[in-house]
Amino acid sequence: MTSLFAQEIRLSKRHEEIVSQRLMLLQQMENKLGDQHTEKASQLQTVETAFKRNLSLLKDIEAAEKSLQTRIHPLPRPEVVSLETRYWASVEEYIPKWEQFLLGRAPYPFAVENQNEAENTIQNEAQR
């Protein structure tokens, strides 16, 4: 009977050791989980900060680019704008004639007399 009693005491001590070790491991797991949550929150904060910084830098770069573009390519002078407008109006006027010619449905759109007229117009423009 004493041997059973001694074995019972030994098993009870072993049980206490196992329970104690289990509690210690559970505490370590909780601590590690808490550390992981803290680290993850820190990383998330770092990512958000970096994102905001990058967004700010991108806006600054775009503003600088826009500023440089206006300095490099200022708005054209009114004479140039007028010339460009007249050019495109002329192009739009002659598109149907050239289109028919290019499709093979009409003769060359400018006759010799039109060429003389065009030369006179150019000379008149140059004299102004």
Curated annotation (Swiss-Prot):
Question: What InterPro entries does this protein's entry cite?
Answer: CEP15-like (IPR028006)
Coiled-coil region list:
none
Q: Which GO terms describe its cellular component?
A: cilium
What Pfam families does the annotation carry?
CEP15-like
Record localization: Cell projection, Cilium
Grouped into one coarse class, the protein's main location is: other
**Which UniProt keywords are present, listed alphabetically?**
Cell projection
Q: What does this protein do?
A: May play a role in ciliary assembly.
Name of protein? Centrosomal protein 15
